[in-house]
């Protein structure tokens, strides 16, 4: 528990940024549904919603492309994106014509995709090599959903709720800008070492190493294809369910912002706790069970011609949806560690989900409207077969030990058994059950650190501050702090601040 708390405390900025993205994305989607329902029929609301959400894919792709090919354009593009996001939200709020509502939704979702790509990448770089990745993802999603529910249920309808959305969008953009500029400010220092407060896992350090080996590169591609297909099948299930509930919301049968949405908070937190058990080896079977449970709500919508069981269907749907978001956020964050373009992959779960939503929504609305049970059963069987093949086909393949050889535990199922032969050389070790203080004392004794070096290491491994802030806290100059860090690196056999922090948390004392 102590180590988990330390990991979460170090990554609180990344958790908050991702939570703000979840809130603004969900709240923008809800606002668009409300506004577009004023101009079109209930069955058309979800069609327009899927198209608007699909526009976010553009933003999700733009940021990684800029990061790798036009890094000097990121600051200007981010500033423009922030302005466009706020302007689009205001346009969406004040529009009096359907064309303007659609335009506002398209621009807002595209800008949110840009912000979400950054938030997911920062989150993945922080938590991908930690044993609490799923719990961190669950915490972010739960926070975002909780803010949405409280805003919907506590704040007065209209301007107050809309003001909260705009303010949170501005806060999200400001936090992401602040994180990048702090990183650039530190990099300008001649003694700079990559900060754990920034993007602490570099593709050059991990992804490129895997892709230098042809066998590992091929295994990565197979694993990504398998994960993407699984996510597509799952997305189709939940997109069909979302289509049904959005239509019910448009006709006033249910309110998707009301108290049942709190079940998303509970289900996501439960998913995070379950998925992190035993090196995330229960993720696939857990997600499969959640998908089966959620499909029950689809059949409730189909067979309940009298419309009396919408609440029961909504509850079942939300219990599964929380698992799904935590699943694809965690999976792609872990997989990104092995990618050469590591900035590109963390948001791919959301991209696949939105693309599948565009493709599945219209057929799902047709099936639900016709109440065709046979068509629903046929579609469900196809989805279940695909999910079983892609998720449950790996259960006999264990790669936990191999995945642990390069530091902290990674999920076996994140990349499957294919990558096991190509991991690095050291033998796997069992993680010791130590508190942070016990680990620190043992580390200091083993590597012969001085008392001052101990104080510095204690701050270094739990702080998300910049080098300048840490130096100020310890009453040291930057150059003196760098000399101490260099000395600790030399004694521990590490090459950088990031490597030292990762080594500290993965290190196990010898008896």
PLM feature segments, named:
Residues 2-55, 226-252:
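Helix-loop boundary and gating motifs at the non-cytosolic
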Residues 1-2, 129-130, 145-232:
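Intracellular loop-helix junctions on the cytosolic face of multi-pass helical membrane proteins
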Residues 99-116, 308-325:
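Hydrophobic core of transmembrane alpha-helices in multi-pass small-molecule transporters
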Residues 113-127, 323-338:
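Intracellular juxtamembrane helix-capping segments at the cytosolic ends
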Residues 128-155, 344-364:
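Glycine-rich segments within core transmembrane alpha-helices of 12-TM secondary carriers
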Residues 284-324:
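C-terminal transmembrane helical hairpin of 12-TM major facilitator-type secondary transporters
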Residues 53-64, 144, 256-280, 353-361:
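Transmembrane alpha-helices of Major Facilitator/SLC transporters
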Residues 412-483, 491, 502-511:
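Helix-turn-helix DNA-binding segment
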């Amino acid at each position: 528990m102590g180590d988990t708390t330390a990991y979460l405390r170090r990554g609180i900025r990344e958790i908050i940024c991702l939570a703000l993205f979840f809130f603004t994305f969900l709240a923008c989607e809800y606002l668009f549904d409300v506004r577009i329902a004023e101009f079109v029929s209930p069955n058309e609301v979800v069609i327009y919603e899927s198209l608007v959400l699909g526009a976010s894919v553009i933003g999700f792709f733009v940021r990684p492309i800029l990061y790798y090919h036009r890094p000097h354009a990121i600051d200007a593009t981010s500033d423009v994106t922030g302005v466009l996001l706020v302007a689009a939200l205001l346009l969406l709020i004040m529009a009096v014509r359907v064309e303007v509502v659609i335009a506002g939704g398209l621009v807002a979702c595209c800008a949110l995709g840009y912000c979400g790509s950054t938030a997911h990448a920062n989150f993945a770089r922080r938590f991908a090599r930690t044993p609490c990745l799923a719990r961190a993802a669950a915490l972010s999603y739960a926070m975002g959903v909780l803010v949405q529910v409280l805003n919907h249920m506590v704040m007065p309808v209209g301007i107050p709720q809309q003001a909260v959305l705009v303010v949170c969008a501005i806060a999200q953009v400001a936090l992401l800008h602040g994180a990048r500029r702090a990183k650039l400010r530190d990099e300008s220092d001649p003694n700079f070492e990559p900060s754990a407060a920034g993007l602490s896992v570099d593709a050059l350090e991990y992804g490129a190493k895997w892709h230098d080996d042809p066998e590992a590169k091929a295994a990565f591609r197979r694993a990504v294809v398998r994960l993407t297909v699984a996510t597509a099948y799952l997305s189709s299930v939940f997109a069909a369910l979302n289509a049904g509930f959005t239509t019910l919301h448009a006709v006033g049968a249910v309110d998707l912002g009301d108290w049942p949405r709190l079940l998303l908070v509970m289900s996501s937190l439960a998913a995070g706790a379950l998925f992190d058990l035993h090196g995330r080896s229960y993720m696939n079977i857990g997600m499969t069970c959640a998908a089966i449970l959620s499909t029950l709500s689809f059949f409730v919508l189909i067979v309940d011609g009298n419309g009396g069981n919408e609440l029961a269907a909504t509850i079942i749907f939300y219990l599964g949806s929380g698992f799904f978001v935590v699943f694809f956020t965690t999976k792609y964050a872990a997989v990104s560690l092995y990618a050469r373009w590591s900035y590109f992959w963390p948001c791919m779960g959301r991209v696949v989900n939105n693309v599948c939503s565009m493709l599945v929504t219209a057929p799902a609305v047709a099936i639900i409207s016709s109440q065709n049970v046979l068509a629903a059963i046929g579609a469900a069987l196809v989805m279940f077969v695909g999910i079983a093949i892609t998720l449950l086909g790996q259960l006999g393949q264990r790669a936990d030990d191999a995945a642990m050889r390069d530091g902290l535990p990674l999920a076996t199922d994140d990349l499957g058994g294919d990558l096991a032969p190509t991991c690095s050389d050291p033998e796997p070790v069992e993680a010791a059950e130590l508190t942070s203080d016990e680990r620190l004392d043992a580390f200091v004794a083993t590597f012969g650190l001085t008392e001052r070096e101990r104080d510095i290491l204690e701050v270094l491994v739990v702080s998300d501050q910049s080098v300048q802030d840490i130096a100020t806290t310890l009453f040291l100059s930057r150059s003196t702090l760098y000399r101490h860090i260099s000395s600790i690196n030399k004694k521990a056999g590490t090459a950088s601040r990031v490597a030292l922090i990762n080594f500290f948390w993965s290190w196990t004392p010898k008896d």
